[in-house]
Amino acid sequence: MLKPLGDRVVIEVLEAEEKTASGIVLPDSAKEKPQSGKIVAVGSGRVLENGTKEPLEVAEGDTVIFAKYSGTEVTYEGTDYLILRESDILAITK
């Protein structure tokens, strides 16, 4: 499994909708870039200026909404993930 460093998290991105509300099937080029996903791994935390480490506010298993064009897309063992900094996460959904 991927283990992110510092204040980074690994997210399994939730797929974009395949159809519109009226039932029209969308081609890949017309789909919105997904902005939500499930956190599968978190780093150890961010290092503050005084040298102490602050743990992340998010945890494995959280479903989050993140900035549209943030992070780095990676494929690991056949699964697509997004690695991004905690500051790119906008909200945790409950």
UniProtKB/Swiss-Prot annotation:
Signal peptide: none annotated. InterPro entries: Chaperonin_GroES (IPR020818), Chaperonin_GroES_sf (IPR037124), Chaprnonin_Cpn10_CS (IPR018369), GroES-like_sf (IPR011032). GO terms for biological process: chaperone cofactor-dependent protein refolding. It comes from the Bacteria. Keywords: Chaperone, Cytoplasm. It is found in: Cytoplasm. Heptamer of 7 subunits arranged in a ring. Interacts with the chaperonin GroEL. HAMAP family: CH10. This is Co-chaperonin GroES. It comes from Listeria welshimeri serovar 6b (strain ATCC 35897 / DSM 20650 / CCUG 15529 / CIP 8149 / NCTC 11857 / SLCC 5334 / V8). The lineage of its organism: Bacteria, Bacillati, Bacillota, Bacilli, Bacillales.
